[in-house]
């Protein structure tokens, strides 16, 4: 039941449904974004795990290379050991290539998913904006409905007042006709007097209304002409003062009218008490009580309406502030989501760059392994010495032949160096040396193989990834040195053998 004449009001506000729909969609969007962020975090964890696995594989390869560097002893069986290590490295390289293909496929799928999520995010923005427009439309409709409700309530109050007035007049007329015929002329005179006073009051009200309308129009014209802040404050203060004066005048007039009515009622009661033939005092008392009850009810209803009006104004202000706060929070949340998306995008870019670096490093490792294979093939040098011993320790002939095949950056070349020595004298010979060098994946390789005619021997030297290898071989003595120098450690290995 409403407060206006006991008539039920069943009006449903459109703002609740629109707000519920908007809140539900925002909550669904947040849940969907949380799930998508969780999936992206899982994928990022998988990528980090794969990168750590590749780092571990790289560490294993580095350890194997270090073992190969430290385990060089110059024996003839080193080739099998290198071949096994090369096969293991080939398997690991193939595994890395397969992982690379898989990672590239994952990156492609992730880019597609990122594009899909971006489209979904843009669609969500469009939906939110459309709902915001619907919300404004619903607010406009709500304002219109509330204005209509206020208009209908005012009309209802006017009708109720008319009904009460008509009932009072009808009851009074019936009582006057049935009970007091002798006071008809007095009542008619009083009625005419009251009517005349009402007409006078109406005329005064019309005059005041006309004056106020003209003043308001003049003030509006003045306001439109000059709208500075000081004039607005002055107009507001004057308006508040005028409203206070009007309220004070209204209260004074209401008090005077109430006193006049009470005086008239008292006079009427005294007149009724003076009449000896009157026997309906109880009816008048009941009527007076009903009038007082109606008056108190009207006052209480007016107080309730004023309190409800104040509550509605406060509620409207709170809703406006709440809407502004929610809009600000929503914009801040969208900015945070955009920043998170940019961070994920940067992380994906960094992962792609790391993958490219790993692929480049893998290519460098393959090139280094190929270089090791070339050096191992070059280490298989066939050297043989044929001696024919005569009388008195006479060395009749010595022949040393060296065949070397060198592959550098995909280019193969060969040479043969040999000489013939008789009786300790050099009768003829040919000496040739070659220097090969290059850089593969940050590892420098270089070597020198030649024969010195003055020392009657073969000198072999090289540099592989910071490992220096050198040696000299002749008919009586073989010596060599292997040294490795790096950024973090240094190591060397020397061997020597004599053949008497």
Swiss-Prot record:
Annotated region (Coil 1A), positions in chain: 37-68
UniProt region (Linker 1), positions on chain: 69-81
One GO molecular-function entry: structural constituent of cytoskeleton
Keyword Cytoplasm included in the entry's annotation: yes
Keywords for this protein: Coiled coil, Cytoplasm, Intermediate filament
Region (Head): 1-36
GO annotation (BP), single: nuclear pore localization
Subcellular location: Cytoplasm
Region Coil 1B: start-end pairs: 82-219
Function: Cytoplasmic intermediate filaments provide mechanical strength to cells. Not essential protein.
Protein name, as recorded: Intermediate filament protein ifc-1
Protein source organism: Caenorhabditis elegans
Classification lineage: Eukaryota, Metazoa, Ecdysozoa, Nematoda, Chromadorea
